[in-house]
Design a protein with these regions (language model features):
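Long, contiguous juxta-domain segments that are non-catalytic but functionally important
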Residues: 226-252, 260-262, 267, 273-384, ...
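Reverse-transcriptase-like RNA-dependent polymerase core
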Residues: 114-129, 270, 375-409
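Short, flexible loop/turn elements at secondary-structure junctions
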Residues: 20, 90-93, 107, 269-271, ...
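Conserved His + Asp/Glu catalytic blocks
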Residues: 398, 405-422, 429, 433, ...
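Noncatalytic nucleic-acid binding interfaces
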Residues: 1-275, 297-302, 306, 456, ...
Length: 607
Protein backbone atom coordinates (compact mmCIF):
# COMPACT_ATOMS: atom_id res chain seq x y z
CA UNK A 1 0.00 0.00 0.00
CA UNK A 2 2.97 2.31 0.50
CA UNK A 3 3.64 2.06 -3.24
CA UNK A 4 0.00 2.98 -3.89
CA UNK A 5 0.25 6.18 -1.85
CA UNK A 6 3.64 7.10 -3.30
CA UNK A 7 2.24 6.69 -6.81
CA UNK A 8 -0.60 9.13 -6.05
CA UNK A 9 1.52 11.70 -4.24
CA UNK A 10 4.02 11.81 -7.11
CA UNK A 11 1.38 12.87 -9.67
CA UNK A 12 2.12 16.21 -11.31
CA UNK A 13 0.77 17.82 -14.45
CA UNK A 14 3.21 18.02 -17.35
CA UNK A 15 2.93 20.09 -20.54
CA UNK A 16 3.94 19.22 -24.09
CA UNK A 17 5.28 22.20 -26.04
CA UNK A 18 4.12 20.73 -29.35
CA UNK A 19 0.50 19.73 -28.76
CA UNK A 20 0.06 22.13 -25.81
CA UNK A 21 -1.67 19.45 -23.77
CA UNK A 22 -1.27 19.37 -20.00
CA UNK A 23 -2.19 16.26 -18.00
CA UNK A 24 -0.95 14.26 -14.99
CA UNK A 25 -0.04 11.14 -16.97
CA UNK A 26 1.65 12.98 -19.83
CA UNK A 27 5.16 11.59 -20.26
CA UNK A 28 7.31 14.54 -21.40
CA UNK A 29 10.98 14.44 -22.40
CA UNK A 30 13.37 17.13 -23.61
CA UNK A 31 14.17 16.88 -27.32
CA UNK A 32 17.45 17.80 -29.10
CA UNK A 33 15.84 21.03 -30.32
CA UNK A 34 15.26 22.07 -26.70
CA UNK A 35 11.47 21.68 -26.53
CA UNK A 36 9.60 19.32 -24.21
CA UNK A 37 7.46 16.79 -26.05
CA UNK A 38 5.07 14.05 -24.99
CA UNK A 39 5.81 10.56 -26.26
CA UNK A 40 3.03 10.77 -28.87
CA UNK A 41 4.40 13.95 -30.44
CA UNK A 42 8.01 12.75 -30.16
CA UNK A 43 7.17 9.63 -32.20
CA UNK A 44 4.93 11.45 -34.68
CA UNK A 45 6.68 11.52 -38.07
CA UNK A 46 3.91 13.50 -39.79
CA UNK A 47 4.75 16.88 -41.28
CA UNK A 48 3.39 18.95 -39.67
CA UNK A 49 2.90 16.97 -36.47
CA UNK A 50 -0.71 15.95 -36.13
CA UNK A 51 -1.54 17.80 -32.89
CA UNK A 52 0.67 20.84 -33.45
CA UNK A 53 -0.28 24.44 -34.10
CA UNK A 54 1.00 24.02 -37.67
CA UNK A 55 -1.75 21.43 -38.22
CA UNK A 56 -4.44 23.85 -37.00
CA UNK A 57 -4.84 22.16 -33.61
CA UNK A 58 -4.12 25.16 -31.37
CA UNK A 59 -7.16 27.38 -30.65
CA UNK A 60 -4.84 30.08 -29.28
CA UNK A 61 -5.12 32.28 -26.20
CA UNK A 62 -8.38 33.89 -25.11
CA UNK A 63 -8.32 37.70 -25.36
CA UNK A 64 -9.29 39.83 -22.40
CA UNK A 65 -12.59 40.77 -24.06
CA UNK A 66 -13.77 37.13 -24.01
CA UNK A 67 -12.28 35.92 -20.74
CA UNK A 68 -14.93 36.87 -18.20
CA UNK A 69 -18.16 36.37 -20.13
CA UNK A 70 -21.01 34.55 -18.42
CA UNK A 71 -22.66 31.64 -20.21
CA UNK A 72 -25.62 33.84 -21.07
CA UNK A 73 -23.35 36.53 -22.52
CA UNK A 74 -21.57 33.92 -24.64
CA UNK A 75 -24.90 32.63 -25.95
CA UNK A 76 -25.94 36.16 -26.89
CA UNK A 77 -22.91 36.53 -29.18
CA UNK A 78 -22.84 32.97 -30.58
CA UNK A 79 -23.61 32.78 -34.29
CA UNK A 80 -24.51 29.11 -33.80
CA UNK A 81 -26.47 27.83 -30.84
CA UNK A 82 -26.54 24.11 -30.04
CA UNK A 83 -29.63 23.35 -27.96
CA UNK A 84 -29.05 21.00 -25.06
CA UNK A 85 -30.80 20.08 -21.83
CA UNK A 86 -28.41 20.95 -18.99
CA UNK A 87 -29.40 21.04 -15.34
CA UNK A 88 -27.63 21.88 -12.12
CA UNK A 89 -27.07 18.96 -9.76
CA UNK A 90 -27.05 19.21 -5.97
CA UNK A 91 -23.80 20.74 -4.70
CA UNK A 92 -23.16 22.69 -7.90
CA UNK A 93 -22.13 20.29 -10.66
CA UNK A 94 -23.95 20.01 -13.98
CA UNK A 95 -25.59 17.16 -15.84
CA UNK A 96 -27.38 16.79 -19.16
CA UNK A 97 -29.97 14.52 -20.69
CA UNK A 98 -31.18 13.67 -24.17
CA UNK A 99 -29.39 14.89 -27.29
CA UNK A 100 -27.57 18.06 -28.17
CA UNK A 101 -29.64 19.41 -31.06
CA UNK A 102 -27.13 19.98 -33.79
CA UNK A 103 -28.03 21.67 -36.97
CA UNK A 104 -29.06 18.89 -39.34
CA UNK A 105 -31.98 18.12 -37.03
CA UNK A 106 -33.89 21.30 -36.35
CA UNK A 107 -31.80 24.46 -36.60
CA UNK A 108 -31.21 25.75 -40.08
CA UNK A 109 -28.95 28.75 -40.16
CA UNK A 110 -26.21 30.92 -38.77
CA UNK A 111 -27.21 34.10 -36.98
CA UNK A 112 -26.04 37.06 -39.04
CA UNK A 113 -27.29 39.77 -36.69
CA UNK A 114 -25.90 39.83 -33.17
CA UNK A 115 -26.33 40.02 -30.26
CA UNK A 116 -29.40 37.81 -30.10
CA UNK A 117 -32.59 39.07 -28.52
CA UNK A 118 -32.89 37.86 -24.91
CA UNK A 119 -36.12 36.06 -25.88
CA UNK A 120 -34.17 34.13 -28.53
CA UNK A 121 -31.57 32.75 -26.13
CA UNK A 122 -32.23 29.04 -25.75
CA UNK A 123 -32.59 29.06 -21.98
CA UNK A 124 -35.69 27.61 -20.38
CA UNK A 125 -35.70 28.32 -16.65
CA UNK A 126 -37.45 25.68 -14.55
CA UNK A 127 -37.85 26.94 -11.00
CA UNK A 128 -40.06 26.59 -7.96
CA UNK A 129 -42.59 29.30 -7.21
CA UNK A 130 -40.97 32.46 -5.77
CA UNK A 131 -37.49 30.96 -6.23
CA UNK A 132 -34.98 33.48 -7.56
CA UNK A 133 -32.79 31.81 -10.18
CA UNK A 134 -32.14 34.69 -12.58
CA UNK A 135 -28.97 35.50 -10.65
CA UNK A 136 -27.34 32.82 -12.84
CA UNK A 137 -28.05 34.82 -16.02
CA UNK A 138 -26.00 37.98 -15.61
CA UNK A 139 -25.53 40.18 -18.68
CA UNK A 140 -23.34 43.28 -19.02
CA UNK A 141 -24.07 45.37 -22.10
CA UNK A 142 -20.55 46.77 -22.45
CA UNK A 143 -18.94 43.33 -22.08
CA UNK A 144 -21.21 41.93 -24.81
CA UNK A 145 -20.41 44.85 -27.12
CA UNK A 146 -16.64 44.59 -26.60
CA UNK A 147 -16.67 40.82 -27.10
CA UNK A 148 -18.73 41.06 -30.27
CA UNK A 149 -16.57 43.86 -31.65
CA UNK A 150 -13.45 41.78 -31.05
CA UNK A 151 -14.96 38.71 -32.75
CA UNK A 152 -16.01 40.70 -35.81
CA UNK A 153 -12.45 41.97 -36.16
CA UNK A 154 -10.56 38.76 -35.39
CA UNK A 155 -12.70 35.63 -35.92
CA UNK A 156 -12.45 34.37 -39.50
CA UNK A 157 -15.88 32.75 -39.45
CA UNK A 158 -17.73 35.73 -38.03
CA UNK A 159 -16.25 37.80 -40.85
CA UNK A 160 -16.98 35.21 -43.52
CA UNK A 161 -20.73 35.04 -42.84
CA UNK A 162 -21.04 38.82 -42.57
CA UNK A 163 -22.22 39.18 -38.99
CA UNK A 164 -23.37 42.69 -38.12
CA UNK A 165 -24.17 44.36 -34.81
CA UNK A 166 -27.81 45.13 -34.03
CA UNK A 167 -27.54 48.35 -32.04
CA UNK A 168 -31.20 48.27 -30.99
CA UNK A 169 -30.84 44.82 -29.47
CA UNK A 170 -27.58 45.83 -27.86
CA UNK A 171 -29.24 48.86 -26.28
CA UNK A 172 -32.01 46.67 -24.86
CA UNK A 173 -29.55 44.65 -22.78
CA UNK A 174 -29.08 45.60 -19.12
CA UNK A 175 -25.98 47.58 -18.24
CA UNK A 176 -25.22 45.03 -15.54
CA UNK A 177 -28.12 42.82 -14.54
CA UNK A 178 -30.14 39.71 -15.25
CA UNK A 179 -32.13 38.95 -18.36
CA UNK A 180 -35.85 39.21 -17.72
CA UNK A 181 -37.21 37.83 -20.99
CA UNK A 182 -36.12 34.23 -20.43
CA UNK A 183 -38.83 31.61 -20.82
CA UNK A 184 -39.76 30.31 -17.37
CA UNK A 185 -41.98 27.47 -16.20
CA UNK A 186 -42.96 26.48 -12.69
CA UNK A 187 -43.56 22.80 -11.89
CA UNK A 188 -47.14 22.12 -10.87
CA UNK A 189 -47.56 21.34 -7.21
CA UNK A 190 -47.99 17.64 -6.53
CA UNK A 191 -51.58 16.66 -5.71
CA UNK A 192 -50.38 14.20 -3.12
CA UNK A 193 -47.30 13.78 -1.02
CA UNK A 194 -44.85 11.28 -2.45
CA UNK A 195 -43.60 8.86 0.11
CA UNK A 196 -39.97 7.75 0.09
CA UNK A 197 -41.03 4.24 -0.92
CA UNK A 198 -42.54 5.65 -4.12
CA UNK A 199 -39.20 7.03 -5.22
CA UNK A 200 -36.94 4.93 -7.40
CA UNK A 201 -33.74 4.56 -5.42
CA UNK A 202 -31.71 3.90 -8.56
CA UNK A 203 -32.92 7.01 -10.35
CA UNK A 204 -32.70 9.18 -7.25
CA UNK A 205 -29.21 8.29 -6.13
CA UNK A 206 -27.35 7.23 -9.24
CA UNK A 207 -27.46 7.75 -12.97
CA UNK A 208 -25.17 6.72 -15.78
CA UNK A 209 -23.36 9.55 -17.55
CA UNK A 210 -24.61 8.68 -21.04
CA UNK A 211 -27.47 9.99 -23.17
CA UNK A 212 -30.23 7.90 -24.68
CA UNK A 213 -28.87 6.89 -28.07
CA UNK A 214 -32.25 6.70 -29.76
CA UNK A 215 -34.93 9.09 -28.44
CA UNK A 216 -38.46 8.12 -29.49
CA UNK A 217 -39.39 11.67 -30.56
CA UNK A 218 -37.72 14.72 -32.03
CA UNK A 219 -36.00 17.11 -29.66
CA UNK A 220 -38.65 19.78 -30.24
CA UNK A 221 -41.43 17.32 -29.36
CA UNK A 222 -39.53 16.11 -26.31
CA UNK A 223 -39.02 19.63 -24.96
CA UNK A 224 -42.63 20.62 -25.65
CA UNK A 225 -43.84 17.50 -23.84
CA UNK A 226 -41.54 18.27 -20.93
CA UNK A 227 -42.86 21.82 -20.65
CA UNK A 228 -46.45 20.59 -20.72
CA UNK A 229 -45.69 17.96 -18.08
CA UNK A 230 -44.45 20.73 -15.80
CA UNK A 231 -47.92 22.17 -15.55
CA UNK A 232 -48.14 24.36 -18.65
CA UNK A 233 -51.56 24.55 -20.37
CA UNK A 234 -51.88 22.38 -23.45
CA UNK A 235 -52.39 25.51 -25.54
CA UNK A 236 -49.07 27.05 -24.49
CA UNK A 237 -46.66 27.83 -27.31
CA UNK A 238 -42.95 27.29 -26.92
CA UNK A 239 -41.29 30.15 -28.78
CA UNK A 240 -38.16 29.08 -30.63
CA UNK A 241 -35.37 31.21 -32.11
CA UNK A 242 -35.82 32.42 -35.66
CA UNK A 243 -34.10 30.15 -38.15
CA UNK A 244 -32.89 30.45 -41.70
CA UNK A 245 -33.62 28.20 -44.63
CA UNK A 246 -30.30 26.53 -45.40
CA UNK A 247 -29.58 23.33 -43.46
CA UNK A 248 -26.13 23.06 -41.88
CA UNK A 249 -24.21 19.80 -41.65
CA UNK A 250 -22.54 19.84 -38.24
CA UNK A 251 -19.94 17.26 -39.26
CA UNK A 252 -18.85 19.05 -42.43
CA UNK A 253 -19.57 22.76 -42.03
CA UNK A 254 -16.38 24.67 -41.35
CA UNK A 255 -16.61 27.03 -38.41
CA UNK A 256 -19.56 25.31 -36.74
CA UNK A 257 -17.75 24.60 -33.45
CA UNK A 258 -16.05 27.99 -33.40
CA UNK A 259 -19.27 29.94 -33.81
CA UNK A 260 -21.08 27.82 -31.23
CA UNK A 261 -18.38 28.45 -28.59
CA UNK A 262 -16.62 31.72 -29.48
CA UNK A 263 -14.93 32.05 -26.07
CA UNK A 264 -13.18 28.72 -26.67
CA UNK A 265 -12.21 29.34 -30.32
CA UNK A 266 -11.70 33.13 -30.34
CA UNK A 267 -10.06 33.45 -33.77
CA UNK A 268 -11.67 30.37 -35.32
CA UNK A 269 -8.41 28.42 -35.22
CA UNK A 270 -8.54 24.66 -34.47
CA UNK A 271 -12.17 24.24 -35.55
CA UNK A 272 -12.84 20.56 -36.17
CA UNK A 273 -13.86 21.15 -39.78
CA UNK A 274 -11.09 23.66 -40.36
CA UNK A 275 -8.39 23.09 -42.97
CA UNK A 276 -5.53 20.87 -41.79
CA UNK A 277 -2.97 18.75 -43.63
CA UNK A 278 -3.26 15.72 -41.35
CA UNK A 279 -6.75 14.64 -40.34
CA UNK A 280 -7.77 13.91 -36.75
CA UNK A 281 -10.66 11.69 -35.64
CA UNK A 282 -13.48 13.33 -33.72
CA UNK A 283 -12.66 11.32 -30.57
CA UNK A 284 -8.99 12.30 -30.60
CA UNK A 285 -9.94 15.89 -31.41
CA UNK A 286 -12.15 16.26 -28.34
CA UNK A 287 -9.65 14.43 -26.12
CA UNK A 288 -6.96 16.85 -27.25
CA UNK A 289 -9.09 19.88 -26.42
CA UNK A 290 -10.15 18.53 -23.03
CA UNK A 291 -6.44 18.32 -22.13
CA UNK A 292 -5.57 21.74 -23.59
CA UNK A 293 -3.06 23.68 -21.49
CA UNK A 294 -5.27 26.37 -19.94
CA UNK A 295 -8.10 23.93 -19.11
CA UNK A 296 -10.82 26.11 -20.62
CA UNK A 297 -12.45 23.31 -22.63
CA UNK A 298 -12.63 20.94 -19.65
CA UNK A 299 -14.07 23.70 -17.44
CA UNK A 300 -16.68 25.01 -19.88
CA UNK A 301 -20.15 24.11 -18.48
CA UNK A 302 -21.64 23.21 -21.88
CA UNK A 303 -18.76 22.16 -24.12
CA UNK A 304 -18.03 18.86 -22.33
CA UNK A 305 -21.62 17.69 -22.88
CA UNK A 306 -21.56 18.92 -26.48
CA UNK A 307 -18.34 16.94 -27.04
CA UNK A 308 -19.66 13.75 -25.43
CA UNK A 309 -22.91 13.79 -27.36
CA UNK A 310 -21.34 14.79 -30.67
CA UNK A 311 -18.73 12.04 -30.46
CA UNK A 312 -21.38 9.48 -29.58
CA UNK A 313 -23.54 10.37 -32.58
CA UNK A 314 -20.45 10.49 -34.80
CA UNK A 315 -19.64 6.93 -33.77
CA UNK A 316 -23.26 5.95 -34.39
CA UNK A 317 -23.03 7.39 -37.92
CA UNK A 318 -19.78 5.52 -38.56
CA UNK A 319 -21.31 2.29 -37.25
CA UNK A 320 -24.29 2.83 -39.55
CA UNK A 321 -22.00 3.30 -42.55
CA UNK A 322 -20.19 0.05 -41.72
CA UNK A 323 -23.53 -1.74 -41.48
CA UNK A 324 -24.66 -0.41 -44.87
CA UNK A 325 -21.35 -1.38 -46.51
CA UNK A 326 -21.81 -4.91 -45.23
CA UNK A 327 -25.54 -5.00 -46.03
CA UNK A 328 -25.87 -2.91 -49.25
CA UNK A 329 -29.32 -4.29 -49.96
CA UNK A 330 -30.70 -2.50 -46.90
CA UNK A 331 -29.32 0.95 -47.76
CA UNK A 332 -32.66 2.35 -48.97
CA UNK A 333 -34.97 0.88 -46.34
CA UNK A 334 -37.75 3.12 -45.05
CA UNK A 335 -39.11 3.16 -41.51
CA UNK A 336 -42.00 0.95 -42.63
CA UNK A 337 -39.53 -1.48 -44.20
CA UNK A 338 -37.65 -1.69 -40.90
CA UNK A 339 -40.88 -2.39 -39.03
CA UNK A 340 -41.62 -5.22 -41.44
CA UNK A 341 -38.12 -6.65 -40.96
CA UNK A 342 -38.51 -6.59 -37.19
CA UNK A 343 -41.80 -8.43 -37.53
CA UNK A 344 -40.47 -11.00 -39.99
CA UNK A 345 -36.94 -11.59 -38.72
CA UNK A 346 -37.56 -10.98 -35.03
CA UNK A 347 -34.61 -12.19 -32.96
CA UNK A 348 -32.31 -12.40 -35.98
CA UNK A 349 -32.75 -8.70 -36.73
CA UNK A 350 -32.39 -7.80 -33.03
CA UNK A 351 -29.10 -9.69 -32.82
CA UNK A 352 -27.85 -7.72 -35.81
CA UNK A 353 -28.71 -4.42 -34.14
CA UNK A 354 -27.13 -5.50 -30.85
CA UNK A 355 -23.93 -6.53 -32.62
CA UNK A 356 -23.43 -3.15 -34.30
CA UNK A 357 -24.70 -1.05 -31.40
CA UNK A 358 -22.44 -2.71 -28.81
CA UNK A 359 -19.52 -0.50 -29.82
CA UNK A 360 -21.41 2.63 -28.70
CA UNK A 361 -20.45 3.10 -25.07
CA UNK A 362 -23.40 3.60 -22.74
CA UNK A 363 -26.11 2.22 -25.02
CA UNK A 364 -28.32 -0.69 -24.00
CA UNK A 365 -26.50 -2.83 -26.53
CA UNK A 366 -23.16 -1.89 -24.96
CA UNK A 367 -24.28 -2.88 -21.47
CA UNK A 368 -25.90 -6.04 -22.82
CA UNK A 369 -22.50 -7.01 -24.23
CA UNK A 370 -20.79 -6.16 -20.94
CA UNK A 371 -23.37 -8.25 -19.08
CA UNK A 372 -22.56 -11.18 -21.33
CA UNK A 373 -18.84 -10.65 -20.62
CA UNK A 374 -19.55 -10.83 -16.89
CA UNK A 375 -21.64 -13.97 -17.29
CA UNK A 376 -18.82 -15.53 -19.31
CA UNK A 377 -16.36 -14.67 -16.52
CA UNK A 378 -18.62 -16.35 -13.95
CA UNK A 379 -19.00 -19.41 -16.17
CA UNK A 380 -15.21 -19.64 -16.45
CA UNK A 381 -14.04 -18.53 -12.99
CA UNK A 382 -17.02 -19.50 -10.86
CA UNK A 383 -18.88 -17.20 -8.49
CA UNK A 384 -16.93 -14.08 -7.46
CA UNK A 385 -15.61 -13.91 -3.91
CA UNK A 386 -16.07 -10.19 -3.19
CA UNK A 387 -18.55 -7.53 -4.23
CA UNK A 388 -17.08 -4.09 -3.54
CA UNK A 389 -18.16 -0.46 -3.78
CA UNK A 390 -15.81 2.52 -3.57
CA UNK A 391 -16.92 6.17 -3.53
CA UNK A 392 -14.97 9.33 -4.29
CA UNK A 393 -13.85 11.69 -1.53
CA UNK A 394 -13.22 14.21 -4.29
CA UNK A 395 -13.49 17.22 -1.99
CA UNK A 396 -10.98 15.73 0.47
CA UNK A 397 -8.15 13.89 -1.31
CA UNK A 398 -4.96 15.98 -0.99
CA UNK A 399 -3.44 14.47 -4.14
CA UNK A 400 -6.44 15.56 -6.22
CA UNK A 401 -6.38 19.01 -4.62
CA UNK A 402 -2.74 19.44 -5.66
CA UNK A 403 -3.68 18.64 -9.27
CA UNK A 404 -6.97 20.46 -9.61
CA UNK A 405 -6.21 23.65 -7.64
CA UNK A 406 -2.41 23.75 -7.21
CA UNK A 407 -2.48 27.46 -6.37
CA UNK A 408 -4.41 26.86 -3.11
CA UNK A 409 -4.82 23.12 -2.39
CA UNK A 410 -5.52 23.61 1.34
CA UNK A 411 -8.48 25.93 0.77
CA UNK A 412 -11.70 23.94 1.22
CA UNK A 413 -13.85 26.30 -0.86
CA UNK A 414 -11.23 26.34 -3.63
CA UNK A 415 -11.18 22.52 -3.75
CA UNK A 416 -14.97 22.30 -3.98
CA UNK A 417 -15.13 24.93 -6.73
CA UNK A 418 -12.32 23.24 -8.67
CA UNK A 419 -14.14 19.89 -8.64
CA UNK A 420 -17.32 21.59 -9.87
CA UNK A 421 -15.44 23.49 -12.59
CA UNK A 422 -13.34 20.56 -13.81
CA UNK A 423 -15.24 17.29 -13.24
CA UNK A 424 -13.34 15.62 -16.08
CA UNK A 425 -10.05 15.78 -14.16
CA UNK A 426 -11.76 14.74 -10.91
CA UNK A 427 -13.34 11.74 -12.63
CA UNK A 428 -10.07 10.78 -14.27
CA UNK A 429 -8.30 10.92 -10.88
CA UNK A 430 -10.94 8.64 -9.34
CA UNK A 431 -10.52 6.14 -12.18
CA UNK A 432 -6.72 6.28 -11.90
CA UNK A 433 -6.82 5.93 -8.11
CA UNK A 434 -9.19 2.94 -8.27
CA UNK A 435 -7.00 1.19 -10.85
CA UNK A 436 -3.94 1.65 -8.63
CA UNK A 437 -5.87 0.54 -5.53
CA UNK A 438 -7.19 -2.59 -7.23
CA UNK A 439 -3.65 -3.45 -8.29
CA UNK A 440 -2.17 -2.79 -4.83
CA UNK A 441 -4.88 -4.28 -2.63
CA UNK A 442 -7.04 -6.77 -4.50
CA UNK A 443 -4.31 -8.20 -6.74
CA UNK A 444 -1.10 -7.92 -4.71
CA UNK A 445 -2.49 -8.19 -1.17
CA UNK A 446 -5.52 -10.46 -1.62
CA UNK A 447 -4.02 -12.18 -4.69
CA UNK A 448 -7.18 -11.76 -6.77
CA UNK A 449 -7.06 -13.72 -10.00
CA UNK A 450 -9.48 -11.41 -11.85
CA UNK A 451 -11.92 -8.55 -11.33
CA UNK A 452 -14.76 -6.68 -13.04
CA UNK A 453 -15.87 -3.07 -12.45
CA UNK A 454 -18.60 -0.63 -13.45
CA UNK A 455 -18.35 3.11 -12.80
CA UNK A 456 -21.45 5.16 -11.99
CA UNK A 457 -22.21 8.74 -10.99
CA UNK A 458 -24.19 9.79 -7.94
CA UNK A 459 -26.98 12.32 -8.17
CA UNK A 460 -24.65 15.16 -7.14
CA UNK A 461 -22.18 14.21 -9.87
CA UNK A 462 -19.42 12.42 -7.95
CA UNK A 463 -18.39 8.96 -9.16
CA UNK A 464 -18.41 5.59 -7.45
CA UNK A 465 -17.56 2.11 -8.64
CA UNK A 466 -19.11 -1.30 -8.12
CA UNK A 467 -16.98 -4.35 -8.71
CA UNK A 468 -16.43 -8.06 -8.30
CA UNK A 469 -13.19 -9.84 -7.44
CA UNK A 470 -12.25 -13.51 -7.65
CA UNK A 471 -9.88 -14.71 -4.90
CA UNK A 472 -7.93 -17.99 -5.02
CA UNK A 473 -8.86 -20.93 -2.77
CA UNK A 474 -12.16 -19.35 -1.80
CA UNK A 475 -14.87 -21.71 -0.49
CA UNK A 476 -17.53 -22.81 -2.92
CA UNK A 477 -20.66 -21.08 -1.62
CA UNK A 478 -22.86 -23.11 -3.97
CA UNK A 479 -22.34 -26.07 -1.61
CA UNK A 480 -24.57 -24.24 0.88
CA UNK A 481 -27.50 -25.16 -1.36
CA UNK A 482 -26.60 -28.87 -1.30
CA UNK A 483 -29.16 -31.43 -0.22
CA UNK A 484 -26.54 -32.97 2.06
CA UNK A 485 -26.79 -31.47 5.61
CA UNK A 486 -23.22 -32.49 6.41
CA UNK A 487 -21.85 -30.71 3.33
CA UNK A 488 -23.89 -27.61 4.15
CA UNK A 489 -22.57 -27.45 7.73
CA UNK A 490 -18.95 -28.05 6.74
CA UNK A 491 -19.24 -25.39 4.02
CA UNK A 492 -20.72 -22.93 6.53
CA UNK A 493 -17.76 -23.40 8.85
CA UNK A 494 -15.27 -23.12 5.99
CA UNK A 495 -16.84 -19.85 4.77
CA UNK A 496 -16.94 -18.37 8.29
CA UNK A 497 -13.27 -19.15 8.87
CA UNK A 498 -12.36 -17.74 5.45
CA UNK A 499 -14.41 -14.55 6.01
CA UNK A 500 -12.85 -13.97 9.44
CA UNK A 501 -9.40 -14.04 7.81
CA UNK A 502 -10.07 -11.33 5.24
CA UNK A 503 -12.86 -9.25 6.84
CA UNK A 504 -12.62 -7.14 9.99
CA UNK A 505 -15.67 -5.45 11.51
CA UNK A 506 -13.96 -4.26 14.68
CA UNK A 507 -13.81 -0.66 15.83
CA UNK A 508 -10.55 -0.45 17.82
CA UNK A 509 -12.03 2.30 19.98
CA UNK A 510 -15.01 0.23 21.19
CA UNK A 511 -14.90 -2.65 23.68
CA UNK A 512 -16.44 -6.03 22.72
CA UNK A 513 -19.52 -5.40 24.88
CA UNK A 514 -20.02 -1.95 23.35
CA UNK A 515 -20.07 -0.34 26.78
CA UNK A 516 -17.74 2.52 25.89
CA UNK A 517 -19.22 3.42 22.51
CA UNK A 518 -20.10 6.89 23.80
CA UNK A 519 -16.43 7.45 24.58
CA UNK A 520 -15.29 6.63 21.03
CA UNK A 521 -13.53 9.52 19.25
CA UNK A 522 -15.82 11.84 17.25
CA UNK A 523 -15.58 12.14 13.46
CA UNK A 524 -12.73 14.32 12.22
CA UNK A 525 -14.32 16.61 9.68
CA UNK A 526 -12.51 19.94 10.11
CA UNK A 527 -10.07 19.22 8.67
CA UNK A 528 -11.52 16.00 7.31
CA UNK A 529 -9.49 12.88 8.08
CA UNK A 530 -9.31 12.14 4.33
CA UNK A 531 -7.42 15.43 3.87
CA UNK A 532 -4.48 13.90 5.70
CA UNK A 533 -1.64 12.85 3.37
CA UNK A 534 -0.27 9.37 3.96
CA UNK A 535 3.17 10.87 4.57
CA UNK A 536 1.81 12.56 7.71
CA UNK A 537 0.44 9.35 9.26
CA UNK A 538 2.60 8.48 12.28
CA UNK A 539 0.30 6.06 14.14
CA UNK A 540 -1.53 3.59 11.89
CA UNK A 541 -3.96 2.39 14.58
CA UNK A 542 -4.89 5.93 15.57
CA UNK A 543 -5.38 6.85 11.92
CA UNK A 544 -7.54 3.74 11.39
CA UNK A 545 -9.66 4.67 14.40
CA UNK A 546 -10.20 8.18 13.02
CA UNK A 547 -11.09 6.83 9.58
CA UNK A 548 -13.66 4.45 11.08
CA UNK A 549 -15.17 7.20 13.23
CA UNK A 550 -15.46 9.54 10.25
CA UNK A 551 -16.23 7.29 7.29
CA UNK A 552 -17.48 3.91 8.57
CA UNK A 553 -20.15 4.75 11.14
CA UNK A 554 -23.80 5.43 10.31
CA UNK A 555 -24.29 8.24 12.77
CA UNK A 556 -27.40 10.00 11.45
CA UNK A 557 -30.70 8.76 10.07
CA UNK A 558 -32.98 11.19 8.23
CA UNK A 559 -36.05 11.05 6.01
CA UNK A 560 -34.12 12.61 3.14
CA UNK A 561 -31.50 9.85 3.19
CA UNK A 562 -32.33 6.50 4.74
CA UNK A 563 -35.56 6.50 6.78
CA UNK A 564 -38.43 4.67 5.09
CA UNK A 565 -41.96 4.07 6.33
CA UNK A 566 -42.94 0.41 6.41
CA UNK A 567 -46.10 -0.85 8.07
CA UNK A 568 -46.61 2.56 9.65
CA UNK A 569 -43.16 2.58 11.25
CA UNK A 570 -40.03 4.43 10.21
CA UNK A 571 -37.03 2.17 9.61
CA UNK A 572 -33.50 2.77 8.37
CA UNK A 573 -33.17 1.20 4.93
CA UNK A 574 -29.63 0.12 5.86
CA UNK A 575 -30.82 -1.69 8.98
CA UNK A 576 -29.30 0.56 11.67
CA UNK A 577 -28.91 0.18 14.56
CA UNK A 578 -27.52 -3.33 14.04
CA UNK A 579 -28.06 -6.18 16.48
CA UNK A 580 -25.06 -7.12 18.60
CA UNK A 581 -23.46 -10.36 17.48
CA UNK A 582 -20.57 -12.18 19.14
CA UNK A 583 -19.41 -14.14 16.08
CA UNK A 584 -19.78 -14.44 12.33
CA UNK A 585 -22.87 -16.40 11.28
CA UNK A 586 -24.47 -17.69 8.11
CA UNK A 587 -28.26 -17.78 7.90
CA UNK A 588 -30.17 -19.65 5.23
CA UNK A 589 -33.89 -18.90 4.88
CA UNK A 590 -36.52 -19.09 2.16
CA UNK A 591 -36.71 -15.29 1.91
CA UNK A 592 -32.93 -14.71 1.84
CA UNK A 593 -31.13 -17.81 0.52
CA UNK A 594 -27.69 -17.08 2.03
CA UNK A 595 -26.79 -14.22 4.39
CA UNK A 596 -23.40 -13.87 6.07
CA UNK A 597 -23.36 -11.52 9.08
CA UNK A 598 -20.05 -10.62 10.65
CA UNK A 599 -19.54 -10.18 14.38
CA UNK A 600 -21.00 -6.90 15.62
CA UNK A 601 -20.33 -5.07 18.86
CA UNK A 602 -20.77 -1.57 17.48
CA UNK A 603 -24.40 -0.82 16.63
CA UNK A 604 -23.69 1.82 13.96
CA UNK A 605 -20.56 0.43 12.30
CA UNK A 606 -20.83 -0.14 8.54
CA UNK A 607 -20.77 -3.92 8.22
Amino acid sequence: MLKFHECLSSLTSAKCDTCLERFPTLSVTSQPNGINECSRCAHDKSIPKRYSSANNMDPGPVPLQLQSLSQTEEMLISAVMPVMSIYRLPHGQYGYSGHVINFPQDVHGFATTLPRLPSEVDILVVRKEKEQTHRDFRVRRRAVEEALTWLLANNIYYRSIGVSVDQNTLASLPEDGDLTDLRTVQPAESQGEVTPDDVSTEEHYSSSFVPNAAPPATERETIEQAVQSLGQPQSSHLMWPSIGGTPINEFQTEGYFSMAFPTLFPTGAADFNGIRMNSVTVGNYFTHLMKYDDGRFAKHPRFRFFALNTEMRWRANETGRIYIRQHPGEAHLTVDDLRDMIGREGESFSNKVVHYGASLRGTRQYWFRERNHLIAMIDTLGLPTIFFTHSAADHQWPELASLICPEDPDNKQARVKAVIDNPALADWFFYYRIQKFVDAFYIHTLKATDYWMRFEWQHRGSPHVHGLAWLPNAPNVEDLLSSSPDLVESTKQEIIEYADKIISTINPAVLPDGSNVSDAPPPKVDPHICNKPYSEVTDLEEDLTDLIATCQRHTRCSESYCLRTRNGKQECRFGYPKDLQAQTNINITEEEPVILTALVYELFLNV
